[in-house]
Amino acid sequence: RGWLGDRLEWRHEAVSEITASWGKEQNIIGPVLGIPFQYKFKSMKDTTMPDGHVERREVEEMLVANAFFLPESLKIESDAQTQTLHRGIYDAAVFRAQIKLTGKFEPPAFGALKIDLKDVLWKAAFVTLAASDLRGTREGLVLDWSGTKRSLQPGSQLPGYTTGATALLALEQPIAGAAEFSIALDVNGSGGIYFAPFAVRNEAALKSNWPDPGFRGAFLPSERAVRSDGFDAKWKVSYYGRDYPQMWTS
């Protein structure tokens, strides 16, 4: 392999160690409104009768699932400041990003999911988001839900994801009107930062002191300005460009 190959491998190992400790690529997905509901489920079960023989009977159970609703609007504002970390003779560029998510949810359309309102468990409603790594967070995360503050706890309830944060809304009554939200995040990362256009209308604005950005993903910026001291970029994306629904059950 030779000396050059060894040097490249050593550099890769050093960079991997730095980014593993600091934070790797950041993917921010959400927020999503989740509301549990109960439903009846019929199944066949074996029942042992008093005389010892087994009969197969239909039984009805009450189960609980979640209905998920995406926002009507989502605005993402992020300031990612970079720095260089060292491991021996090797360097790695990393960033610390302050991210603010704001927007609104429309009243959940349970009828479109064929869910009866009497089966909705409003007190167990929650807002959740997925994030690759929240190790950069130095203070407790807070959700502002129409003026009410709710603490975000570690862990995502979004199907398919585990890392992130979730806030229990503990609603006393059904959501009757549009609900505005805001969440502030403080994250470490390296390599890149990605956001999912989860709303009907999505806007994102990212600024950084990194002078040589590369724009990847399914949507390129609608506006960008790259300078020697950093860059600014903006996106506007509608839900027509995505391949997942506005609501679903799981």
Briefly describe each language-model feature range:
Residues 1-2, 6:
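Hydrophobic alpha-helical transmembrane signal-anchor segments
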Residues 37-46:
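Membrane-proximal extracellular/periplasmic loop immediately following the first transmembrane helix
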Residues 9, 13, 20-21, 30, ...:
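Soluble non-transmembrane domains of integral membrane proteins
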